[in-house]
Structure formats: C-alpha cells, structure tokens
Amino acid sequence: MDGNKDDASRCLRIAEDAIVSGDKERALKFINMAKRLNPSLSVDELVAACDNLDSVSRNSSVSEKLKTMDGDDDKLETGKMKYTEENVDLVRNIIRNNDYYAILGLEKNCSVDEIRKAYRKLSLKVHPDKNKAPGSEEAFKKVSKAFTCLSDGNSRRQFDQVGIVDEFDHVQRRNRRPRRRYNTRNDFFDDEFDPEEIFRTVFGQQREVFRASHAYRTRQPRNQFREEEINVAGPSCLTIIQILPFFLLLLLAYLPFSEPDYSLHKNQSYQIPKTTQNTEISFYVRSASAFDEKFPLSSSARANLEGNVIKEYKHFLFQSCRIELQKRRWNKKIPTPHCIELQDRGFVDRHIPI
C-alpha cells in the first residue's frame, strides 16, 4: 500500500512538471494514474490547472518527422532515393513505439542473450550508414537505448515497473543526482548518450563493414585482381583470428602470473586506500601491512611505484578527456570533469578548449 502511495506521489510530480511545460494531455494522464493508485489524493487543483492549458502533444517533433516520411513515400517510386519502403516502415515503427521490449521484438521474460541478439540484428538494419530513410538516426538511438536499458539488471527492473519509455526517461532524469567531480560512470539516459559507442562495443571492428563496402565500389579497375585476392584470403585469415584468442588463453594458463601491486580503482581484490605523497592521487592495494613492508615510505621503491601510479592515472585522464571532447561535439552542455582535472593537476602545458 505504501508503494502505491509513493508511486502516486511520483505521478503527481510528473503531472506538475507537465503543467509547467504546458502539456495538458500528459498532465491529465498522470493525474488519473495517481488517482487510481491512491484514491484519497486530492487532485482538484491540478485538474483545474489543466483546464487552463491548451493541449500540447509532447511528441510533436516525432509527428513532424513521420509526416516528412509520409511525404517522401511518393519519391521512392522515382528511383532517386537511396532507401526502400521497408526502410521507412522500420524507422517509423521504431520511432512510434513506446516499449523497449516491443522495439526489439522481445517478450518481457526474454534472456540477456536474446536481448543482445535482437540488438545486433536490428541495429544493423537501422544504422544510418546502411539505412538512409529519414529519421534513421533517431530510430538507431532508440534501439541503442532499448538495448542499454534491458541488458542492465537494475535499469530493466525500473523499466518493468514503469513500462513506458517516455515516463522511464523522465524518471531517470528526475532522479539524477549531482555527479561527483571525477565520476567515471556512464549514464546512458542523459544528454551524453552515444549510440555509436554502444554499437562499437557490441560489434567491435565490424563497424567498418559499411565503409569497406563503399570503398570497394570506388576503387580503380586496375586493382580488381587485388580485391579478388583479398576476398579469397579473407575467410582463412578470419578463422586464424578467431582461433588465436584460445591459443593465447592456453599459453597464459601455463605462464607464471603475479598480481599487480596496486589498482587505480577499488574492487574485490583491492580495497585498502592509499594516496601518493605529493599529488594526492588515490589508489588501492590488497594488504596495507604487506604493501608498507614491500614499499616503505620515503624509499626508492615507494617513489617508483607512486611514479607509475601518477603516470597511469594521467593516461586514464587523457583517455577520458578525449572521449568527453568527442561527445561534446554532439552536445555542448556535456560536462568534461576529466579535462578539468587534467588542467587543475597541471598535467597539460596548454589550455584544453572545452
């Protein structure tokens, strides 16, 4: 019962936000939902506020894009377009759908493996490099969000409780807390969500398949014999590449292996915090007594180890800053905490254009 009251209060907060933004339909929807969850709630004032609003569809931008798609249907018959009616229908259905399970064509009891397979299949069909239909970028982003949400246990449970994409995204943004300055966690439901990063993570270098096919068509005829040689040798090379990791694993199994002396990030094995003396960079060790015995304070061994910590952390900041700057090209509002820390710690000689 208390859970229903909490959900009802949350619905009222969403309704209040909708009223402020002038979205009458959304406000009434969540007012009614709150009333069903907790009949004792008084919603007369909110209903009265809704009566003073003109109904504004919060999906107007999507509707305009769909109308543009409809207008382009006639152009498909001229043969000038680089997409088919099937491409348009696929993009249109994904954009209109408000259920992550339905977008991927899955049931609610599906496994993580089924989610991954569905994403691999659908993302290839809707990727903007392959599907040139209007709205393919938005559809590709929505497919990536569906995969990211459902493949994570916590976000999937939260979505199952809500069941609607729009409300789920709204709750994610509303519940977001101010981030710590050097937080490295990826939040896939804010403005810095990058569908290409998800695609590269799942497919790896297979991302280049679209560009490779284009390059093949633009080569000069005198290089055709080279292309045939590559095509013939391709499968055998691919087989070797696939088998190579297994040989490496077998080799590593018989090699002597020693645990690292430290880790920049806390985990089950490294939980004891330490800090470098001058730069105050945090790192973690397995055992405080064993570490201090092996690396006494003010010893050359301790100085060398802390030098490695600083070097590794500096490299981590550079890599993280590079990713932040790439994302910032898409959205200027994206924060760049790692770039700021690089400058604050004096790890760079020049100002980073943020």
Swiss-Prot record:
Q: Which stretches are transmembrane?
A: 237-257
Topology in the lipid bilayer is annotated as:
Single-pass membrane protein
| J domain ranges (all copies) | 99-163
Task: Output the Gene Ontology cellular-component terms.
Answer: membrane
Q: Where in the cell is it found?
A: Membrane
Cite the entry's keywords alphabetically.
Answer: Chaperone, Membrane, Transmembrane, Transmembrane helix
Predominant cellular place of this UniProt entry's protein: membrane
Q: Give the matching Gene3D superfamilies.
A: DnaJ domain (1.10.287.110)
Its biological purpose is as follows: Plays a continuous role in plant development probably in the structural organization of compartments.
Family, according to the entry, reads as follows: Belongs to the DnaJ family. C/III subfamily.
What protein does this entry describe?
Chaperone protein dnaJ 49
